Amino acid sequence: MTSRKEPLRVILMVIVLVILAPSCRKKDPVYILEGQVRSHATGQALSGVTVSVEQRTVGGNVFSGAFTPAASGSTISDGTYRLEWPREQLAEVQLLAAKASYIPATITLDPEDFLPDEVVYQNVRLQPEAFVEVTLTNTGEAAVEDLIRFRFTQASFDCACCNGDWKEIWGADADTTFSCRIYGDIWLKYWAEITAESGNLLIIDSLWCPAFVSTPLVIEY
């Protein structure tokens, strides 16, 4: 009787081992990044923000030349996110956050902060976007020598129109309109120097630029 039960017992043990084997397998180590994204202007938690990690790695003593995607996801209703990706030898790592109507953010992270299966925390503040539409108009009979020089000053952010360079417009070309994407809910200082037959004029002023809308700025001379 014992000899008949022995093969059955072996079969049952094999089945149990097959079932338990996957649960006993050691999980591959991962990096974990968590945080929350809020509006810089209001402090409100932002849902639906696309968050992603890019990395440059070292493998076989070879340094990867470009950033490659490592993980991506989006924030939930309370603005939080969690990203996981396989462990590699990190050389550089950065977090990207983007949402419609907000200025994208790129944050450089310290590779040495990342340890296998340990959480690294990084919160993000996104600036709401706005636009300013500038119109420079010579309302008189424009002379060739007429000149207006215009620039935004003291802008503490990257903006195609806000780098401090002068925009110079001569004579008949003075009817000009251009638009810039800027941070919302800020005061934006501007400077205009006008040289014309009707007289010279210096304008130094500021413009309030609400978030999510386009604010007009018209200078006539």
What spans do the regions from the language model cover?
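Sec-dependent bacterial lipoprotein signal peptides
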Residues: 1-24
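Short, ordered, surface-exposed loop/turn motifs in non-cytosolic proteins
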Residues: 42-63, 140-160
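A short, amphipathic beta-strand motif
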Residues: 33-39, 79, 132-139
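A short, solvent-exposed loop/turn motif at the edges and junctions
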Residues: 86-115, 193-202
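Short, acidic Ser/Thr/Gly-rich low-complexity loop/linker segments typical of extracellular
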Residues: 59-80, 158-174
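Beta-strand-rich domain onsets/edges
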Residues: 20-32, 36-41, 118-129
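Extracellular beta-sheet/turn segments enriched in Thr/Pro/Gly and aliphatic residues
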Residues: 110-129, 133, 200-221
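Short Pro-Gly-centered beta-turn/loop motif in secreted/extracellular proteins
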Residues: 77-93, 168-191, 209, 219
